[in-house]
Amino acid sequence: GVNGGRCIKIQQFPENGKCGVGIKQKLTGLEPDQLYRVYAKVKYSDIPQDEGRGAILFDMSQKQYWGASKFLYGTNLKNWTSLYADFLSQDDGTAEIVCALGFRYGGTTNGGYSTGTVYFDNVSVVKVTDELFMQEGEHVRLFIEPSQVYASAKQITEWLANLDKMYLSYAELMGATPHDGRKLAILSSRGLESSYWALAGYPILWSSNYSAVTSTFEELAKHGTWSFGLMH
């Protein structure tokens, strides 16, 4: 482990096939429907680039199946790397967090499952406060990596007000509201494959790996252009 003690080790040799193997821990006593972050220190080796999701953290939410940390590939046994994943707690104040090699589903564009070796230590969970830029409207909550917020708080408030209008229009069109009528949540995430701009669910995952987030805010700041494509 980090200080010479024990840690979690998951290993899968290529000759045994790709895997999605994780160590799961159930959490209780969380505030219901609030954003939390799980941290871990990680070392890893021999994980082929873009083969599945590699070494990852994720939670077992049934409202957002695809949420995860960024994916780690290759070999890094010299230093412990920090890894984190954000997730919404369940309505009963619980969550199930997983330290894994490969993902729980194999149906992702990179196959989900992986081979190699990964070590996890110093796993902790905190409620998100200033780790993310957070703002909300009447029907939408926003959780964004601060370095990617290129618009002012006022401009984002106006954007959220427009998203609220779109929410009401969708509700009128469909005759129903998603997720039992609770506010939509939009969460920027590095745990998406390169082919995805965003993924539907609760929360909606908005890829911060490339320019999806920054370009939206740049257009908002420079031209007042606002997008509602995230409400899919």
Regions found by a protein language model. Give the residues of each.
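Extracellular and organelle-lumenal recognition/adhesion modules and their flexible linkers in secreted
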Residues: 1-131
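Juxtacatalytic substrate-recognition/specificity segment
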Residues: 136-232
